[in-house]
């Protein structure tokens, strides 16, 4: 049912997804759901299916079908699901599309080019779909996810590049002067607002959100569709949450400008530039960045430990969207690291 803050959360979910798609977004996870079922089926007699809403529609079907026949393959269930609810002409494509949506959430988003392929799959299905199929909420919701994932990835690539360019301006502060370096860096960071990327994807998201409200009364926004709160499935309201350190950097820039001397301002800029530099002989692990955890002891992971009782667990801290440095993550247990003869060690997290 829930992607984070739950018993069987999405493993290794990218922070960009956590910040935008949130806890109760549409989350077809057929492979993960089957892994949970098979990990614990020998400890139970019988089964029941639990659901909190339409967002986990695929998962409850997977669970129910496995309860009847544990040997059924997830793809077989998805084909039957798609044929019954969407149409036999789209059954194979839609079933494969649901698997692709699950793969969209595997590992670092910035390097997951499959997200764009998934969107193309659903766009092709949309072209072929009958008018009746296009009105079915299950079809609309999968489309919404495909567009949402692609929009988040487009923004992540863009905003990461803008921050990289801004940091290069800060590295030149000793030559250009702090005032100019801050102004140029800030202008680059603000391009995410003045020249936003992938607005066609964003516009389509809003169209699909309206379609879902009309077809099944999906409440994807607090103001537009009267959702209880942003964290309760209203991820239309978080589509544009910053995916880089723009808010934190701009706050720091304001503080630096207030410092009385150039030497103090330069020292503060150096602190930002060298934030992830632990010094000679050290290493820096970022426990909220899936691509920067080489020393983290991950444990068995899926499928043998789907509840992460013995595995590392990265999740989103519920501290709001204020100007703080990303990532803001929590760990459900003490993090363990491989021992190496190199000190000091630096790592970033919020406990």
Each model region followed by its residue ranges:
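Active-site core of glycosidic bond-cleaving carbohydrate-active enzymes
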Residues: 1-55, 171-175, 187-193
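Generic low-complexity segments that are intrinsically disordered, proline-rich and/or Lys/Arg-biased
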Residues: 8, 12-18, 22-34, 109, ...
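Short secondary-structure boundary/capping segments
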Residues: 9-13, 62-67
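General secondary-structure edge motif
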Residues: 27, 61-62
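C-terminal non-catalytic alpha-helical accessory regions
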Residues: 51-59, 71-293
